[in-house]
């Protein structure tokens, strides 16, 4: 607010003097030695004189300013009714009569009372300047205000002590001039500093980096609570780095651990597992009954059902409210021994979390359909997968896993190099007879048990001799060379080869297989797709198409996959998955095998043979024999150094000797 003209500003000059007195007694109060009786009495005497001047000042304002204003405005009343000046004077008089033993207690009381008075007196003066001065300008004429000011100054100067301190009226006028410049600076600075302290003290105004660091110390439950405070906190609480490791089973039971999965390496005891199985059984029975009769009790009285319900609600909340925001940052998901996990929930979680590295589904009631959402390269970063005790898992799940692990760049280059060579069919066939099949296809001879002939699709402009192709069934349609499979060929019934030949794909089929394009050229030793070259369709202005160009045409995003790592799986446990066969083991060798696999547990896989094990082990060069487990009844690879079966005398997982 701009200062009023000097001639009619009734408050600025006297208030400047009052503020000067406040500053003086505050300084004396801080410098006084209260243990010294002399200093203490000197302070009280100074305070007594100061507050007498305060009281005189208030009396002058009441008589010459506020009293006149009340006569012209009914809104002004009781302005100085609670200034506590008289009470303060009584306090000072009482202090002068105290003895030395009472001084310290009195000093503390004095400081508190002075601090309270100061906090009221300064705003009171500011109110007079900002509220009553404009009212005076409204209800009085200019000349009337000039006369009032002269009377006010005369009354203040009539006091001997005041007149001496001000050194006459001229000094007062100089003070007024200065006050016009600094009138509101002190109070505004105090108010501004107070606001700054208030705003800076608020945790909501901390930088996002600091808030994120604070949130990193919170558990998932606390993060969810913080997300309900405001929009800013909700966004920070959904930061991916805070949700790298998910343990819904533990969280549902009150354990909010969210660190790396290192402490979960040890198997729980049978009692703990038995309790989890009882929970799952009780929940399933209750769930079935609830579907039939919804009027029955909710089952909250049963602790097992209550825990399973909490787990189910927690999983649903994760899927719907958290994973859509942080799914790409999730590295670990542990659902071991879950009572409420379903195929649908797992499928949704895996779709949201493409960068998963650690997946533990031990002893859950899932089946192959849980992995239906996996397409080519969907989990290229997966390093640890534990399916122990998942009795419904079959070879189909391993096919999906092999597809989702992708294909290493080095393996792709080797296949493409094989496509680009100009060798004749006779040369290839001769090399196959010499046993160099791995050099041609990049795969080991995993299908040596089958007698089907090798089948190649070649460019129609570069066909082999009729003698070499005598056993082939080959037809040409408008210059397009397409090789049809012979009836006696055995291949995956549900695998990547049971589909139309690439040269005859329609637009619909191309769209359907777009995501899995790189595995359409699987490199199976039976399918021989590693030597396929396709001539352009009739009417096309493109020349001969290689595998690489066809992949780019069908799935333009596949170029990015070449730059990523793939098939980095290090830990695979299928313990107790008794429906797994050699076929499931062999599909894991496709696309480059498992070059980083160190831990392989096939305990309780009753339907695999030594041949299937050998094919898989040959594609796992990093396998550690100490962490290689399979049934003792199987004559398999590394029989002398492998660790054997882990499920002996195990009451909750399949084992060929469980009856012993």
Swiss-Prot record:
Q: Where are the LRR repeats?
A: 311-337, 338-362, 363-389, 390-417, 551-576, 577-604, 605-630, 631-649
Name the cofactor(s) required for activity, per the record: [2Fe-2S] cluster
The record's section on SUPFAM superfamilies has: F-box domain, RNI-like
Report the principal subcellular site.
cytoplasm
Binding residue positions for Fe(3+) 1: 15, 57, 61, 127
Q: Which domain of life is it from?
A: Eukaryota
GO cellular component assignments: nucleus; perinuclear region of cytoplasm; SCF ubiquitin ligase complex
Q: Tell me one GO molecular function of this protein.
A: iron-sulfur cluster binding
Q: How is it modified after translation?
A: Ubiquitinated upon iron and oxygen depletion, leading to its degradation by the proteasome. Ubiquitination is regulated by the hemerythrin-like region that acts as an oxygen and iron sensor.
Q: Where is the composition biased (Acidic residues)?
A: 285-303
In which compartments does the protein localize?
Cytoplasm, Perinuclear region; Nucleus
Annotated spans, Disordered: 283-305
On assembly, the entry states: Part of a SCF (SKP1-cullin-F-box) protein ligase complex.
Q: What does this protein do?
A: Component of some SCF (SKP1-cullin-F-box) protein ligase complex that plays a central role in iron homeostasis by promoting the ubiquitination and subsequent degradation of ireb2/irp2. Upon high iron and oxygen level, it specifically recognizes and binds ireb2/irp2, promoting its ubiquitination and degradation by the proteasome.
Q: What is known of its domains?
A: The hemerythrin-like region acts as an oxygen and iron sensor by binding oxygen through a diiron metal-center. In absence of oxygen and iron, the protein is ubiquitinated and degraded.
Name by which UniProt lists this protein? F-box/LRR-repeat protein 5
Q: Which organism is it from?
A: Xenopus tropicalis (Western clawed frog)
């Amino acid at each position: 607010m701009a200062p009023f003209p000097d001639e009619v500003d009734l408050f600025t000059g006297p208030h400047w003097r009052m503020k000067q007195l406040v500053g003086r007694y505050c300084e004396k109060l801080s410098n006084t030695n209260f243990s010294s009786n002399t200093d203490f009495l000197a302070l009280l005497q100074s305070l007594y004189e100061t507050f007498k001047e305060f009281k005189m000042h208030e009396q002058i304002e009441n008589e010459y300013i506020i009293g006149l204003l009340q006569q012209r405005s009914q809104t002004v009343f009781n302005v100085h009714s609670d200034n506590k000046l008289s009470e303060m004077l009584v306090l000072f008089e009482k202090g002068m009569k105290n003895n030395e033993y009472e001084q310290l207690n009195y000093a503390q009381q004095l400081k508190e009372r002075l601090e309270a008075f100061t906090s009221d007196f300064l705003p009171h003066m500011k109110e007079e300047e900002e509220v009553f001065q404009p009212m005076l300008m409204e209800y009085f004429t200019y000349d009337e205000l000039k006369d009032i000011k002269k009377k006010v100054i005369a009354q203040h100067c009539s006091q001997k002590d005041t007149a001496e301190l001000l050194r006459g009226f001229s000094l007062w006028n100089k003070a007024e001039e200065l006050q016009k410049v600094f009138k509101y600076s002190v109070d505004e600075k105090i108010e501004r500093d107070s606001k700054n302290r208030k705003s800076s003290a608020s945790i909501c105004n901390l930088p996002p980096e600091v808030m994120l660091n604070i949130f990193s110390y919170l558990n998932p439950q606390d993060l969810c609570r913080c997300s309900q405070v405001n929009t800013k906190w909700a966004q920070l609480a959904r930061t991916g780095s805070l949700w790298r490791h998910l343990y819904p089973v533990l969280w549902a039971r009150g354990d909010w651990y969210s660190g790396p999965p290192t402490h979960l390496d040890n198997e729980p005891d049978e009692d703990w597992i038995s309790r989890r199985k009882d929970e799952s059984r009780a929940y399933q029975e209750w769930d079935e009954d609830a579907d039939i009769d919804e009027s029955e009790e909710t089952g909250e009285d049963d602790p097992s059902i209550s825990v399973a319900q909490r787990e189910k609600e927690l999983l649903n909340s994760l899927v719907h409210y958290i994973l859509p925001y942080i799914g790409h940052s999730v590295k670990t998901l542990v659902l071991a021994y879950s009572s409420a996990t379903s195929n649908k929930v797992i499928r949704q979680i895996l779709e949201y979390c493409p960068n998963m590295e650690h997946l533990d589904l031990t002893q859950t009631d899932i089946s192959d359909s849980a992995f239906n959402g996996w397409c080519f390269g969907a989990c290229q970063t997966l390093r640890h997968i534990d399916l122990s005790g998942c009795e419904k898992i079959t070879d189909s799940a391993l096919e999906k896993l092999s597809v989702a692990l992708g294909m290493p760049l080095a393996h792709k280059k080797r296949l493409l190099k094989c496509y680009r060579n100009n060798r004749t069919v006779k040369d290839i066939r001769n090399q196959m007879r010499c046993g160099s099949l791995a050099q041609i296809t990049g795969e080991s001879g995993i299908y040596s048990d089958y007698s089907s002939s090798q089948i190649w699709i070649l460019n129609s402009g570069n066909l082999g001799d009729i003698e070499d192709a005598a056993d082939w069934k080959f037809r040409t349609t408008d210059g397009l060379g397409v090789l049809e499979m012979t009836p006696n060929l055995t291949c995956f019934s549900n695998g990547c080869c049971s589909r139309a030949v690439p040269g005859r794909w329609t637009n619909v089929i191309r769209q359907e297989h777009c995501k899995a394009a790189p595995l359409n050229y699987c490199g199976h030793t039976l399918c021989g797709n590693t030597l396929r070259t396709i001539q352009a369709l009739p009417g096309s202005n493109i020349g001969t198409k290689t595998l690489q160009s066809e992949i780019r045409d069908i799935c333009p995003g596949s170029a990015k996959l070449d730059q990523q790592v793939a098939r980095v799986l290090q830990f695979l446990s299928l313990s107790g998955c008794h429906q797994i066969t050699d076929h499931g083991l062999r599909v894991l060798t496709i696309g480059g095998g498992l070059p980083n696999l160190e831990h392989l547990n096939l305990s309780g896989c009753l339907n695999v043979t030594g041949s299937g094990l050998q094919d898989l082990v040959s594609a796992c060069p990093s396998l550690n024999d100490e962490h290689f487990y399979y049934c003792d009844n199987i004559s398999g690879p590394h029989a002398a150094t492998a660790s054997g079966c882990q499920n002996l005398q195990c009451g909750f997982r399949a084992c060929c000797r469980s009856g012993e």
